[in-house]
């Protein structure tokens, strides 16, 4: 029932085919309706990376809601591309604090939870579902719902599970089949991740054990040695900066003012060093087999936030109420000025 004249009008866009004809036409040409319309519901890894980093850059330059609306439209367009939705969830989690008020921030967290729930309920890829579950738990913590977070991940992330103790199995298997290249690479990756995890864990430990001075002081002593030994201030500036900042908070609670400014000075120096360079994940002379792994990460090795937003966060960190007794101290004023001047150069 399709005439040449009808097809000619479709080709010249004078008219469109009846929607009921689309399945018939698709069957005739041996393609799906999506293929017939030129609709591609799935994105490749490089496409996802580009969209993520483009949106992250726009968050630093454009009105927040304008970028959020653009990302929401992309979510609707690629609602069945679960790897993309996972990265949008990460994007929203990394930027929701820049919404104009707490109510708006909470609304974005709620949207992100809904997106993660959609992934978990519909995606067939277990690894993507597990990542979405962990993200959902993080959002629950941010929303003040710790019990819901526990219900989601307590069993999955339990240290009693064999999966949490099995990093050496893959390394040993590669070694036994003679693939020493992968064995060495995976060993370095495992060591690198455990190093970061140890410092992150110590940072959290200092935060909630501030009343136990002896334990905190010993933790700081050990972590300072570890950070220097592995040159972490150059290897992973973000982890090192967060550690020094948390120690500064602890020392302010202990009224060790000289210690506070020594740590805040390191915090500011590391942030500035991070922004002066490429600001990408990297190895060093010891961890020299990580590059391929970094390149293979879902978002590549680039920062998950734009440099300007990283600097804005650092400026906000110095406004922490814990430092209010020092607000007129020239040293704090100077550190704030350093970050402000750095912001003007970006």
Explain the meaning of each model-derived region.
Residues 41-42, 72-79, 117-125, 153-162, ...:
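Solenoid-like repeat scaffolds
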Residues 1-16, 38-42:
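Recognition helix of helix-turn-helix/homeodomain-like DNA-binding domains
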Residues 57-72, 102-117, 138-153, 172-184, ...:
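Helix-turn-helix repeat elements of alpha-solenoid scaffolds
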Residues 58, 92, 99, 133, ...:
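Residue at a conserved register position within TPR or TPR-like alpha-solenoid repeats
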Residues 198-329, 333-334, 338-346:
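Alpha-helical protein-protein interaction modules
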Residues 46-80, 87, 94-103:
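Alpha-helical segment of the N-proximal tetratricopeptide repeat
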Residues 20-35:
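DNA major-groove recognition helix of helix-turn-helix/homeodomain DNA-binding modules
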Residues 45-52, 78-85, 96, 124-133, ...:
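Generic helix N-cap/helix-start motif at coil->alpha-helix transitions
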